[in-house]
């Protein structure tokens, strides 16, 4: 097992449902520690920058509009195989395909409003973490 960090977003629809605490409890019960977190309301420019890899995709404008529609929680999760574990907790991107008990099965409203985002690889995690957090913002958990 490899101790690693991953990046996570609780999206506007899940924040609006007051699901932050319930989602954080799922991370922690799966052995992931929250080592940085903050609430932000993305500007269009920030959302376009974060999702730049999807700029040419047909869903890009809708995604940016959704991600700027309300506040989000961004967090860094740390644990053994954090990227894989978080993706298991989240469930399939399309909530109709998500297994019962996953975050998307429980909190998503649609494919676009799918409640959470999580890095898909350690390299993506590193890039996404750096987009929102400086090294000084991250508090390694020693206890």
Curated annotation (Swiss-Prot):
Primary site of residence: cytoplasm
Enzymatic reactions: a 2'-deoxyribonucleoside 5'-diphosphate + ATP = a 2'-deoxyribonucleoside 5'-triphosphate + ADP; a ribonucleoside 5'-diphosphate + ATP = a ribonucleoside 5'-triphosphate + ADP
Pfam families named among the record's database cross-references: NDK
Residues holding ATP: 11, 59, 87, 93, 104, 114
EC number: 2.7.4.6
Cofactor field: Mg(2+)
SMART domains: NDK
Gene3D superfamilies attached to this UniProt entry: Nucleoside diphosphate kinase-like domain
CDD domains hit by this protein: NDPk_I
Active site positions, chain numbering: 117 (pros-phosphohistidine intermediate)
Molecular function, one GO term: metal ion binding
Top-rank EC class of the record's enzyme: transferase
A GO cellular-component term linked to this record: cytoplasm
Sorted UniProt keywords: ATP-binding, Cytoplasm, Kinase, Magnesium, Metal-binding, Nucleotide metabolism, Nucleotide-binding, Phosphoprotein, Transferase
Localization terms from the record: Cytoplasm
GO biological process: CTP biosynthetic process; GTP biosynthetic process; UTP biosynthetic process
Family: Belongs to the NDK family.
Function field: Major role in the synthesis of nucleoside triphosphates other than ATP. The ATP gamma phosphate is transferred to the NDP beta phosphate via a ping-pong mechanism, using a phosphorylated active-site intermediate.
Subunit structure: Homotetramer.
UniProt protein name: Nucleoside diphosphate kinase
Lineage: Bacteria, Pseudomonadati, Pseudomonadota, Gammaproteobacteria, Enterobacterales
């Amino acid at each position: 097992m490899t101790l690693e960090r991953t990046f996570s977003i609780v999206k506007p629809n899940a924040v609006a449902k007051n699901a932050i605490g319930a989602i954080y409890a799922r991370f922690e019960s799966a052995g992931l520690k929250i080592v940085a977190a903050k609430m932000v309301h993305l500007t269009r420019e920030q959302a376009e920058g974060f999702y730049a890899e999807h700029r040419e995709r047909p869903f890009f404008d809708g995604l940016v509009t959704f991600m700027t529609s309300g506040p989000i929680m961004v967090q860094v999760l740390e644990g053994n195989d954090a990227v894989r574990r978080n993706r298991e907790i989240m469930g399939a991107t399309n909530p109709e395909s998500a297994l019962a008990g996953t975050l998307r099965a429980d909190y998503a409203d649609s494919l676009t409003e799918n409640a959470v985002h999580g890095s898909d690889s350690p390299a993506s995690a590193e890039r996404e973490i750096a987009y929102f957090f400086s090294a000084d913002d991250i508090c390694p958990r020693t206890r």
